[in-house]
């Protein structure tokens, strides 16, 4: 044991590799809450790269308004909390509720300049306080690994937006501090089990080492099949029919014509039963492999998806920060029987690439991404590394670009996320006014949709995707939300169809999983 009471002890061991992460996740986690599967793949080759699983969590960290709720899930987590409480600044109120500790942060003044707002004490500091009390002497890249989601509605803590009600239990953010990680490298075909020990408790250390051996043993077993649930009638419903959604599009277009905004992304929700989310995720991953795929099991909800779009990515070593705006969408070129017609597909791509409306919308959002980075990056460090490429998925193709900058000294990945949220491709421009209008016209919280899911570490790295092409499942009902980018010369009927096209891959996966 280390003599340093605040040093993280890392226990690592290799285990048998298996190419199917979904099967492993089911075998090790089943429906247990506080578990998470994050996966990455190459866009064009659709080849798996890495799968990271939180098998056990030491703590659940969630936020509502200006408070953060810390709930230990093991003795390991309880000891973190005991250490953390000794370091809480006086400006932060602290109280206990049931098994949780609540931190209440001062409300952020919303009429101050960007830098003052960025450096104000905020709910993000709950993570910073936790990271600062532990030493990662060996500089292991995932010693403190926080995996989870930032909801779209987190922005209301930092900006003046209409107050909305929501019928979902999704917090402003919900993260798990990993106690047991499993990392699959699909290129090297390796499997690593990693335990992070934050406690000095000898019994807890013994338990965690025993847990590592148990997981290795389970990985040598025949993997359990993912259970299936059949549903006779799967009816798709929506909170807005085509006419209602089209009416909102037309109203927002009038505001664009008046010059109030340049672009806006209204959305609508689709609902269908989903008693078996993991089976649906398995179908989605197979039919629509994407750069980012995720499956999150919380005590209140399950969230899964296959997102084409990075939200924000930060590498602490290089201090490079990336945004990946996607704007411009077309359906894939398919025949009536659903087979891909390569000639039709290429003609659709050509039409999209040369469409003035799509190009104007895309370049506007590239410019917005550049502006987002300008606030937090070193002057002269921003550049566009990829401009107007095409990425293809099972039901749609997109115009994409990549914008990169170098983060200013004194800022970290959480500062960067706070400054850039929510991504312009899910809001519009100018961003704050677009979000205000979205709130007024949609009339309810977006929850996970349009936020971000991924991870960050104590070493400062962050990798997230925008939570789109996803299903939020609560009480066995899936909510699939999708929108369309509206500009001056948008054709409302086309945008109505686009919202359904974007949701279709997830809808089909859920249906196919329950037949």
UniProtKB/Swiss-Prot annotation:
Swiss-Prot/TrEMBL keywords = Amino-acid biosynthesis, Aromatic amino acid biosynthesis, Lyase, Magnesium, Metal-binding, Plasmid, Tryptophan biosynthesis
One GO term in the molecular function aspect is:
metal ion binding
This protein's superkingdom?
Bacteria
**According to the UniProt entry, what is the EC number of this protein?**
4.1.3.27
Reactions this protein catalyses:
chorismate + L-glutamine = anthranilate + pyruvate + L-glutamate + H(+)
Task: Indicate which residues the UniProt annotation says bind L-tryptophan.
Answer: 40, 291-293
**Residue numbers binding Mg(2+):** 361, 498
> Which GO BP terms, alphabetically?
L-tryptophan biosynthetic process
**Which EC class is this protein assigned?**
lyase
Is Nucleus tagged as a keyword?
no
**One Pfam family of this chain:** Chorismate_bind
Q: Write out the residues that bind chorismate.
A: 328-329, 449, 469, 483-485
Cofactor(s) demanded:
Mg(2+)
Activity regulation statement = Feedback inhibited by tryptophan.
Task: Determine if Amino-acid biosynthesis is one of this entry's keywords.
Answer: yes
On cofactor binding, the record's note says: Binds 1 Mg(2+) ion per subunit.
Q: In which pathway does it act?
A: Amino-acid biosynthesis; L-tryptophan biosynthesis; L-tryptophan from chorismate: step 1/5
Q: Which NCBIfam families match?
A: PRK13564.1, trpE_proteo
According to its UniProt record, which protein family does this protein belong to?
Belongs to the anthranilate synthase component I family.
Subunit info here reads: Heterotetramer consisting of two non-identical subunits: a beta subunit (TrpG) and a large alpha subunit (TrpE).
Q: What is the role of the protein in this entry? A: Part of a heterotetrameric complex that catalyzes the two-step biosynthesis of anthranilate, an intermediate in the biosynthesis of L-tryptophan. In the first step, the glutamine-binding beta subunit (TrpG) of anthranilate synthase (AS) provides the glutamine amidotransferase activity which generates ammonia as a substrate that, along with chorismate, is used in the second step, catalyzed by the large alpha subunit of AS (TrpE) to produce anthranilate. In the absence of TrpG, TrpE can synthesize anthranilate directly from chorismate and high concentrations of ammonia.
User: Per its record, how is this protein called by name?
Assistant: Anthranilate synthase component 1
Instruction: Identify the gene encoding this protein.
Output: trpE
